[in-house]
Amino acid sequence: MQKKDVNNVLNIGATRQENQICPHTNKKCIKLSKTEKGICSFIFKDTSQIICPNYFKKIDFVKYAADIIFSGKNYKVIKELKYKDNYFDYVIVNNENHSDFFVIELQTLDTCGSYKYFYNTSNKPLTVNWKTTEKNLISQIIEKGALLKNYEAKLVVVLQNTLFDYFNLDNIETPDGEIIFMIYNNNSKNINFERKVCASLELIKNRFNTCNKLDLIEIISKKL
């Protein structure tokens, strides 16, 4: 397959339109820059990998989460709420009791390399930056999860199955955990809800603190 055969490689979205309007929000693409065009997703290891959070707006993830947590309660949605040093993507609030709420965060994959690779073979290939994505997401889960725990509020993380599988968290599932992963697949023309996994904040902290310790020990051992 030719690298320049863009239609077979990328789901370009807004960049194929002269007005650069995102197909998921009907607003200007947030991925544009002076040097590179915006991209919604790209094919990596035979799977369409989501790299823009607006891609999730093709589905009603708010309703799915509210059905799980609020079970028929009336609610309102607050978008992009700032609290001290934190930004919450969505805060879902019970209309009848404003102290009853939960938070939704959208997480997509970080990349490294250049989008220009698909237009110019001299550029470094675009690929998934798993380590950076893991670092950013886990730090957010731990920090925001700890904050929300003070209010007995849950944190819902919307993400793609490939990212969740990379974390290997299935074996720490906790039925009433503070963190709820809403996992979607993107292997067909439509993004589909696949499953939810509840996890304890403490178990997540312990899992990744242990991994970090092992990583450091491994680095030290290689230097000896």
Region spans (language model):
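General "foldedness" signal
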Residues: A66, Y117-N120, F167-N171
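A cross-family glycoside hydrolase active-site/sugar-binding cleft signature
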Residues: E80, E105, V158
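Short, well-ordered loop/turn elements at secondary-structure boundaries
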Residues: D85-Y87, N97-S99, N150-E152
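Conserved catalytic-core segments centered on acid/base and nucleophilic motifs
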Residues: D89-V93, G145-L148
